[in-house]
Design a protein with these regions (language model features):
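Short, small-residue-biased leader/transition segments that mark boundaries at the very start
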Residues: 1-7, 11-13
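Surface-exposed amphipathic alpha-helices with a cationic face
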Residues: 8-10, 58, 107-119, 175-180
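Conserved, mostly hydrophobic/aromatic
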Residues: 15, 67, 153, 190, ...
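Active-site groove signature of glycoside hydrolases
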Residues: 17-25, 50-96, 124-126, 219, ...
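Solvent-exposed loop/turn segments at secondary-structure junctions
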Residues: 18-21, 71-76, 128-133, 157-163, ...
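Aromatic-rich peripheral "rim/lid" segments of glycoside hydrolase catalytic domains that contact
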Residues: 23, 84-95, 170, 177-183, ...
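The substrate-binding groove and active-site-proximal loops of carbohydrate-active enzymes
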Residues: 32-46, 96-101, 158-165, 192-199
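Glycoside hydrolase catalytic-domain groove-lining segments
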Residues: 116-123, 130-201, 210-213, 217-218
Length: 255
């Protein structure tokens, strides 16, 4: 039995996408209501939204241990065709221009807003491709150069059944590099494998969790989205079967 109330009230991650749609490397579009805002107005909107959502959680007695500012923000966030207000970070096509300073400032804006509501919450900057050290050095060098405020470097990792060993090795090496290079804690914020490859998924997760535990600065490994069952709604990387029961993959978290 899974107690969602317990999960929600004790240790949880709150992830703000700052978009009308699911934000990921292919889509970091700002909310329609924020179109046309100046840079200062965008930051004010980010602050207000972040504080509103977190205050609502606080009112319900929910205290997130961690809060993400953005979701898989390797290509930046709050894209715009106008460089003056864009938070793009390249790699997202010529339509959405790069502005390293804005991206860094958006991260800081979100972080400051989080701390105003939950001073003890740790703020995560979360990127895709946890095995891609070049991406992580690129983004976090930029954040360092611009004095961005955050606490934790978060990663996603979604290997296939034939790539998990090499990707796990690369991800672990990347985490160690992030700790050494930036003196930050790290976390696997998202991990997953096809629900119908449960035995291989368990083997992968067991190895990833064991190696992550050996890194003192690694805060944990989170599966996304385990309760998506049997390819529900086209999503195949959950960890529940077609009957709605957990697969053996979840046993890896018992270690």
């Amino acid at each position: 039995e899974i107690s969602l109330g317990l999960v929600g009230s004790e240790m949880c991650i709150r992830d703000s996408h700052y978009s009308d749609v699911w934000a990921d490397p292919g889509s970091q579009h700002k909310p329609a209501a924020w179109e046309g805002l100046s840079l200062d107005e965008l930051k004010a909107a980010m602050t207000a939204h972040t504080k509103d959502v977190l205050s609502a959680l606080k009112d319900k007695g929910i205290t997130p241990e961690w809060v993400q500012v953005g979701n898989e923000t390797g290509p930046g966030m709050l894209w715009d065709t106008d460089a003056a207000v864009s938070g793009g970070m390249g790699g997202n096509g010529v339509e959405y221009v790069e502005n390293k300073k804005n991206f860094s400032d958006f991260i800081t804006t979100g972080c400051v807003a989080v701390k105003e509501v939950f001073p003890n919450a740790k703020v995560i900057v979360h990127l895709q491709g946890g095995d891609d050290n070049n991406l992580y050095r690129w983004i976090f060098d930029v954040l360092k150069e611009n004095n961005a405020q955050y606490d934790v470097i978060g990663m996603s990792l979604y290997p296939g059944t034939d790539t998990w060993k090499t990707m796990t090795s690369s991800c672990i090496a990347n985490m160690k590099d992030m700790v050494s290079r930036y003196n930050k804690e790290v976390m696997i914020c998202e991990v997953g494998m096809s629900w119908d490859e449960a035995a291989t998924s368990k083997e992968f997760l067991t190895e990833l969790i064991a190696q992550s535990k050996a890194i003192d600065e690694c805060l944990g490994v989170f599966y996304w989205e385990p309760q998506s069952y049997g390819g529900w709604n086209g999503y195949t990387l959950g960890a529940f079967d077609e009957s709605g029961k957990p697969t053996v993959a979840m046993d890896a978290f018992n270690q």
